[in-house]
Amino acid sequence: MNSLKFKLTFYTLFGLIWSLLVFFFLSPWYEETLKKDIFELKQYKFSNFLILYDKIEYNKFDYVDGAETYFRDAFGFETKTLEGIMTSIKVLSTLAFLSTTFLIYFTIIFYVHIKFIFDTENHRRLGKKVWCYVLIGSPLVSFFLSFITLFLIIGIPSAVRNDCYKEYGKKFCNSQLRYHTSFIGENQVWLWGPSRGWIILMVDTILTFFATIYCWRNAHKFDEVKMKKKKKNYLNNNNNKNNIL
């Protein structure tokens, strides 16, 4: 019963973690938006920039009828620092996703009785050790990767500002209200801060942290029934061989 309870909890937790990472990839991570109340026309939302997994959208109008219009394709200066951070975010978040996928896939294989290295004399002990490492190591890796990614996204405003400094200097950039210094905030004209992708990743990171602790405390339960069966079969086979001899 303990093993079954652990399996259900395990697959529920990591199924949710996996799904949250998928939604993170599909959602915008950070945005800077012009306040609506300074416009007479209310039929659209204006985003100065919107950062997603595969692109950065600049000056985008979302109309009620679904039409989209872009009238600028860059910040007006090179964004090498921002692009470097974006690349790091993509790599780390993808590795976190692959780590979670690997864990789910590997445990499924384990439970459909596909044999790897367990056909040895010490298969029970070796198998349990391997799976304890997998069950603790994979979520721990995913947690650290997601945690680092969270802080990389926090660095997006600083990256934009630093790129502006390189092109125009601090005096000009500091006079531009858009090139703000905080991760989240607003002024007379702009609202800026994390979008729903960052919030999803934060929830995913917290959930992965607790899932890691759960696996660490209960990893032995995941294979206890299977290993008991393996040990029983192994002993029976040895007894049969001895009887034949």
From Swiss-Prot:
Stated name of the protein: Uncharacterized transmembrane protein DDB_G0287341
Sequence intervals crossing the membrane: 10-30, 94-114, 134-154, 196-216
UniProt keyword Disulfide bond present: no
Primary location recorded for the protein, binned into one broad class: membrane
Lineage: Eukaryota, Amoebozoa, Evosea, Eumycetozoa, Dictyostelia
Disulphide bonds in the chain: none
Domain of life: Eukaryota
Keywords on record: Membrane, Transmembrane, Transmembrane helix
Location in the cell: Membrane
Gene Ontology cellular component annotations, sorted alphabetically: membrane
Protein's membrane topology: Multi-pass membrane protein
